[in-house]
Amino acid sequence: QAKRREAGLVVRARDVKILLQWFEHDVMSLAGPALAVRQELYDFIISELKQRAGKSYPGVRKLRTALHNQRNQLLAFAGVLDQKLADIAQHFQLPLQAVRDICLLHRKHPTSNAYWERWNQLHSQLFGKFHGVMEAVGEALKKTPRASSLVENLNSRLRNYFFLRRSLGDSYLSLLQFFCN
């Protein structure tokens, strides 16, 4: 019975690992699909984590709950990026999908054959506009911070101050608000 339980745990751990890899690569990657697709993938991953959580696995349950509660905040960057890509498409008078394809090219490693094959395809499709669009998309990616990293950075810096508030009172909170503004 212990071997069966161990085998079940190994399968569950492998499944959760795969789901988290999908989450990182397909949902949270800056150069990725449109917001609607990311939301659909996000919901699928949450659903799959829910099936694997159970009462015996509080770590998976906590992870699923945290991800479920933070969906809109974690994906906020994708909406910003979508708008930037739409602006680039309008500026260069191209279909949005062509600009999205260049965005997805940024996911590939520049020394890989797949990168250069796709680069050549896109270059031949867009010809004179390719380099301008490539540069604009690169800038859009650089200037689109993922909300989660900003929130985590801010939380880590402010967490200690908010715990101090419990012992120091509301006057300390007023001082902290003044300092942060």
Stretches found by the model and what they are:
Residues Q1-N181:
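Acidic/histidine-rich catalytic cores and adjacent linkers
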